[in-house]
Amino acid sequence: MESIPAAVVGQKINEWYRHIKKLNVTDAEMLREEIKRELDVMEEDEQAVLYFQLMDFRHEQMLEYVNPSQNQVNKADYLRAVEGEGKKLTGIMEYYVHFFKGMYEFSKGEYIKAIAFYRHAEKKLDKVADELERAEFYYKMSEIFYHMKQTHLSMYYIEQAYHAYKAHKANGMYEIKVIQCRFVIAGNYDDLCTHEKAIPHLKEAEESARNLGNKYMLAKALLNLGDSYKNMGDQDRALYFLIKAVDQAKESGAKELTQIYYELALLHFKKKEHESGKHYFELGVESAERFNDWFFTNLLNVLKLLYLEGAQPTAVADALEELDDIRGYPYLEELALVSAEFYTEIGHMDESVYFYNKMIYAQKQIRRGEFLYEI
């Protein structure tokens, strides 16, 4: 059989990547198999092989995103295949390598490592000609800065991603990307305590997700609405949206179901509705075990010690220590405040002061986060 030019295979990989970014699973799977067959008869080209390996890694990330309840293959294997040891990479390939490594580290909660890779990728962003591909990079930067509570940096990047995706919203292919951008925008507004600006974005996201029939995105929209109303102090509305989120998360197999149960348990416990709190706590533990979610297992453990097992201050303090890292600081801040208020209500002021100080410690660590990745 006559060999296939590497440029032809490269163009097919580009098309494959477009389907991956649009979450077109069926088309992406078909192209993946077609390209695999063509690689066997392609003219020798190291860059094309590396490009395929990178897209294969990105394909696995897409599958994990659209099927969060399923265990996927070890993505670290893909990264080891594209380390580039002894290989000279082009500018665009350097961009992809660092960008996808950043995504991988982010998925593990390694935010500082992820930012380091994203920064390397950003230096090669001028090699990326496609506006929507640059928007993907901007979105990922905004996402990680949001999780690190670096609100203004997150807003800087999300604005660029949002406008790029919204400009292409008419064909319906990038509606999900617009929804994702709205989640980040709303989360940043919540962190700025301007909740009235967050709610419209989340309601737009909810409506869009309903129109698309996307239960996973709808579950996230309802969860975020519940969280925003909780931050506003409107517990009844928060409960309303969180309860609605449960069904959508169950139907879509969303791992966010654990977070929804955690939020419901916390709200009921704070309202002194012990039995309801215990009910959702138990569901949360089940869900955390099913999804192997150690992070929310730690959060639920704090609720257990505080509300179900006698509120021993040393045990609660030890449980909060598990959240003493860059991913856990926002939750440490919230749960330390919850603990301080709990002990204030029962008249244990020494313990209350201790947990207030723990909250202040978490706030300081969040503020320090912006300096951790600077040289």
Question: In which residue ranges do the predicted regions lie?
Answer:
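Flexible inter-repeat linkers and adjacent short helices
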Residues: 1-101, 281, 323-326, 331-375
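Residue register of alpha-helical TPR repeats
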Residues: 10, 51, 96, 136, ...
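Structural register within alpha-helical repeat arrays
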Residues: 15, 56-58, 101, 141, ...
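Residue at a conserved register position within TPR or TPR-like alpha-solenoid repeats
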Residues: 19, 60, 98, 105, ...
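Helix-turn-helix repeat elements of alpha-solenoid scaffolds
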Residues: 20-36, 64-81, 109-120, 150-163, ...
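Flexible helix-coil transition and linker loops at the boundaries of alpha-helical arrays
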Residues: 38-49, 80-93, 124-132, 165-175, ...
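Long, mid-chain structured domain cores
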Residues: 56-156
